[in-house]
Amino acid sequence: IIFIFLLVIFSPQAGAQIWQSDVPAAQTSTTQNDSGPVAVPIASEKALSYYKTRNFWWGFGIIWGLFVPALFLFTGWSAKIRDVAQRLGKKWFFVIGLYSIIFTLITFLIDLPIGYLSDYSMEHSFGLSNQTIGKWLQDNFISLAISCIMGFLFLWVPYLLLKKSPQRWWLYTSILAVPFIFLMILVQPLWIDPLFNKFGPMQDKALETKILALAEKSGIAGSRVFEVAKSEDTKKVNAYVT
């Protein structure tokens, strides 16, 4: 893990050195419909710094995500949370649900400062965010609520499979995870995304017509286009498709 972490940190700089040594001025590329080469500008120092910083936090997040559960397990905190959940709940599935909520709340508080540094502070330091601290906290608390609800409703399933089939519970859990993932793909744009963004009709009707025509040409009939004032949060995203 440490090797991978160090590799992630230093690989952007190594890549930048190779890039800058191999490309004297600008890269060129062509596409099928281009009449000539298209110049690709060399990444700026700021872009390379952002890339390196983002990868640092990505690697740190992997290690942190392993460290925190291990800390709960080996310090006995997990057992204490279990005891509290058992006092509050009678049935085993309620105990698991309550444990999930308590664990999620504690880890949320532990992770919040890290999230502030790796997300809110970093994006603002590179001038890529318009998000206020209030909106950032609001989004995090919404994510917390969703995590608590999902954990309470569904975490008991793998434990039930573990009780019924100690040898193959992991296989059955994996099989059940497939339809669950597809369900979440359908649910997210309808009920979860609107919790973070305000969707409305597209103001530029001419652009909407072009987008719908392109979708129909691609075999996607009956599409709808919505507009979100995402510039309130970020300067990086201008559109996405779901």
Regions found by a protein language model. Name each.
Residues 3-4, 14:
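Cleavable N-terminal signal peptides
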Residues 17-74, 79-242:
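Polar-ligand-bearing catalytic/cofactor-coordination segments
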